[in-house]
Every structure is written in C-alpha cells, then in structure tokens.
A protein has these predicted regions:
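Structural/interface elements that position substrates and couple domains in central-metabolism enzymes
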Residues: 1-181
Length: 181
C-alpha cells in the first residue's frame, strides 16, 4: 500500500504516470479512511499449506477488518483466488458476524478474480478481459460497471459468484497444464 501510494508498482503493471493520474483510486488499510468508503476490494494472497489446502487466514483477516466497518448498502468485492463457493461460504459469514448486517439485504458482495501474472509483459491488466460477478443481478451490474471503467479491453459478467470463482480455478489449471507440457 505504501508503494502504491507513492506511485510505485513492484509488479510493473502500471507506470508512475498511470497511478498518479488515477483520481478516484485510494490505497489504504487505515480503518478511519476505510470507514468513508462504500465499496471495498479485498485482494490478498491465498497460498496453499503443507497439505496443499488453501490457507485462507489472510483473506479471512482482511474480511474481518472490513466486516467491522461496513455500513448498510456497502459493496465488498473479492479478488483473491479461492475455490468455488468460498466467498459465500467462508467470507460472507465473517462479514455478517462482525458487521451485524445481513447479506444481500444490508450489504452486497461481488467476485472478480485478479488476472495479474507478475512479470508477464504480454498478458497485462490492460489487455486481459476481467471476469465480474455479484451476489444479485443488480449487484453484478454495479461490479461490472466498476471494472469497465478500469479495464480497457472489457469485462465478462459471470452468472454467479461461484461461476466466477470456478473460472479462475479453470484458468489456473489450464496455465499449469500448458506449463507442464
């Protein structure tokens, strides 16, 4: 966050000029600043543990932090790579617990898997279509509109959060198979 706020992207997806010219974008993990927002994007690493199971600790910790500050009608978009169903089965209950709000009544969720492959200069955030989804059709439209403003080559709206989560897993599997052969 500190690096991005001084317009430095260690993944080299964005140059200084692009980051400095983005007027609506703010990077922060300060809870006072976060309380002012109505849309949150959670994108944290989701490594696998020694047993090759997803380690969701960072994701759930970030979700808990956001759960403590969300308000009615807020939107939380997840980007971390997870298994199909994780957002609604693992993250939503944490948001409900810490916010005391009800999912799809008081707050809403979206999922749009990150598509950045650090170091890949061919398939960058600027030229890879972004998959989007939402917890309700009207929420999916909002999530899609947010990313349409950012992703030049466009978006693809998935019919559900679970389908968008599965698309990311399929993409990773295909990449791994291509590398293996």
């Amino acid at each position: 966050i500190k690096e991005l706020n001084i317009a430095y992207d260690k993944n080299f997806e964005f140059n200084k000029k692009e980051l400095k010219s983005s007027k609506k974008l703010k990077f922060t993990n300060n809870q006072k600043d976060l309380k002012l927002a109505n849309c949150f994007i959670i994108s944290v690493p989701t490594p696998v543990d020694k047993l090759k199971k997803p380690d969701l600790r960072l994701l759930l910790k970030a979700t808990q932090m956001i759960g403590k500050i969300i308000k009615k009608n807020d939107l939380i978009i997840f980007e971390s790579t997870v298994y199909p169903g994780c957002t609604e089965e693992q993250c939503v209950p944490v948001l409900e617990k810490f916010s005391k709000l009800k999912y799809n009544k008081d707050f809403f969720c979206g999922y749009s898997p990150e598509r950045i492959n650090p170091g890949d200069k061919v398939h960058t955030i600027s030229n890879v279509k972004k998959i989007t989804s939402g917890s309700k059709p009207e929420v999916a439209d909002i999530v899609d509109d947010i990313y349409k403003d950012i992703i030049c080559v466009g978006t693809h709206k998935a019919p559900s959060i679970k389908v968008a989560e599965a698309a990311k897993i399929i993409e990773n599997t295909q990449r791994d198979l291509n590398i293996a052969f």
